[in-house]
Amino acid sequence: MNETLLLFHAPSRPELLKIQRALLPLHIRLRCISQKDYLQPLGFLAGMKKFSPTTEVYDGEELSAPLFLFCFFQNNRLDQALAALRRCGAGPFPYKAILTPTNCEWNVLTLSLIHISEPTRRS
């Protein structure tokens, strides 16, 4: 599968353009996910054929901040993408996750509930 970066709660247009320009030389596909699709399985949003869409449409609150989900990245490419995002000047982006065999069945609300509350549990 092709490297894909899913972006939930996309920032304003100027910041989004900075992100796109940073990823372009790396040939990384950026996909902005609409709020109405927040109940879809992450694997489906990433393009995994074994996942089907849900018929539910999300109409709740937006995430508190942008969240990046890195899909199908090898370690060195993940490092390159993270470095490009740091240098682009659109951040900081506190919420980043990697698609795994476990979380590909979740939706972004489940991911964000676990991911965003993690720093709180460490304190």
Question: Could you describe each region identified by the protein language model?
Answer:
Residues 59-85:
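Mid-chain, well-packed structural core segment of small domains
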Residues 9-15, 38, 73-77, 102-106:
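Gly/Ser/Thr-rich loops at beta-strand to alpha-helix junctions
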Residues 1-50:
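N-terminal, charge-rich interaction modules
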Residues 1, 55-61, 86-88:
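Short, flexible, solvent-exposed loop/turn segments with mixed acidic/basic and small polar residues
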Residues 45-65:
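Short, structured active-site "lid" loops
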